[in-house]
Amino acid sequence: MSVLVIGGSGFIGTRLCLRFSRYGKSFQIIDKARSEFFPEVVLRGDVREPLALNFSLEPTVFINLAAEHRDDVRPLSLYHEVNVDGARNVCDLARAKNVNKIIFTSSVAIYGFAPLGTNESGIIAPFNDYGRTKWEAEQVYKQWQSEDTKNRTLVIVRPTVVFGERNRGNVFNLLRQIASGNFLMVGDGLNRKSMAYVENVAALLEYSLDFKPGIHIYNYIDKPDCTMNVLVAHVNKLLGRSSEIKFRLPFSLGLLIGSSFDLVAKITGKKFPISAIRVKKFCANSVYESAIESTGFIPPVPLMEAIEKTVRFEFIEDHKNEQVFYSE
């Protein structure tokens, strides 16, 4: 088996390829960016364009991790070009190379403002272009699989927010605030957040290489979901501080402060780490469920251990000159 990892120079792709390298799996990467870890196996390519490439090893599986998902993507048409047109180009390449297995990372963003406990059968109601184009990309892959249902395998993984060492997304920003000692808890802290550790996501993608023909769709969440109180206390304890949260800001006051920063930002053009939407996101519940256990998959790293690994790497050990990934 030879795997082509499309978008393999990124955060999840790098972690996945490290697993492949560790366990002796053959792989190549297509990416518009150079891989700091595996430059020797990278083929430069952009999923927005037809992928006519010469491979040193003919792939038997495609894993597509390429995506546009930052909140500030401009022009907005990039979401469609990368997520939807990119899916079409991947499927065209699969047809040309007679590849019968595609693994695609979608997102729980397709559910939009989902009810607590939304699973794979949840209502599709994306509220932004990222979620909408991820859903549209899923339909492109389903069409490809429907052309030869007896032989083609499609795996769609919908992770919640992915965190881990080297990532500079929303979870890192929260951990950095806590580590700075300037973190202020807003609200009662009882709200829960579903999260996914990058090593576990990579392990699931690797595990799904053995799935049989058909369509396999799974949310991915590391359980159990922890409350903000538990998360903040755990991080403080790891940093050698008291786990007690001594002061809390009422949600209404936190929202007022966030709105004030929004006004100042609008007037001055400056960006601030506090905003009304960030206060709302922090205090909101975001809980998803998954049927992944039915496959027999067991995540290699428990959630609390994953948080510990991330905190140690980012705020205790010295990795300041190493590569990081900006994803959100």
Give short role names for the model-derived ranges.
Residues 46-85, 89, 93, 111:
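NAD(P)H-binding glycine-rich loop region in Rossmannoid oxidoreductase-like domains
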Residues 128-155:
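Active-site Tyr-X1-5-Lys
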Residues 78-89, 124, 132-135, 196:
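Glycine-rich NAD(P)-binding loop of the Rossmann-fold in SDR/ketoreductase-type enzymes
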Residues 167-173, 187-209, 216, 230:
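Substrate-positioning beta->alpha
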Residues 89-129:
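Conserved Rossmann-fold NAD(P)-dependent oxidoreductase catalytic core, especially the SDR/UDP-sugar
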Residues 208-273, 301-328:
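Mid/C-terminal beta-alpha module of Rossmann-like enzyme folds, strongest
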Residues 3-23:
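N-terminal Rossmann NAD(P)H-binding glycine-rich loop of SDR-like oxidoreductase domains
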Residues 111-112, 152-172:
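Flexible, glycine-rich beta-alpha linker
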